[in-house]
Amino acid sequence: MPRSLKKGPFVDQHLFVKVARENEKGTKNVIKTWSRRSMIIPDMLGHTIAVHDGRKHIPVFVTESMVGHKLGEFAPTRTFRGHVKDDRKGKRR
């Protein structure tokens, strides 16, 4: 179920302060965050936000089409290495 429009988008306060500070200074430094639950707002456009995936920080460059999505959507947490191929020759009796 989507979030109510009267509540507005959720952004962690510490992340919002960091983005506002970067906008105020006019710089585009990488912002490191663990807040995967924060929604991307128009103030974040053009910034690179390093989102934690549980092991390392994945840099995400925010574009206009990402507004309204959550940061965690762009940093996958699971790595799929593929299924193991069957070795038919080894199964002979």
From Swiss-Prot:
One Pfam family cited in the UniProt record for this chain: Ribosomal_S19
Keywords: Ribonucleoprotein, Ribosomal protein, RNA-binding, rRNA-binding
GO CC annotations, alphabetized: cytoplasm; small ribosomal subunit
rRNA-binding as UniProt keyword: yes
Biological process per Gene Ontology, one example term: ribosomal small subunit assembly
InterPro entries assigned: Ribosomal_uS19 (IPR002222), Ribosomal_uS19_bac-type (IPR005732), Ribosomal_uS19_CS (IPR020934), Ribosomal_uS19_SF (IPR023575)
UniProt record similarity statement: Belongs to the universal ribosomal protein uS19 family.
Annotated function: Protein S19 forms a complex with S13 that binds strongly to the 16S ribosomal RNA.
Protein's recorded name: Small ribosomal subunit protein uS19
Organism: Pseudarthrobacter chlorophenolicus (strain ATCC 700700 / DSM 12829 / CIP 107037 / JCM 12360 / KCTC 9906 / NCIMB 13794 / A6)
Originating gene: rpsS
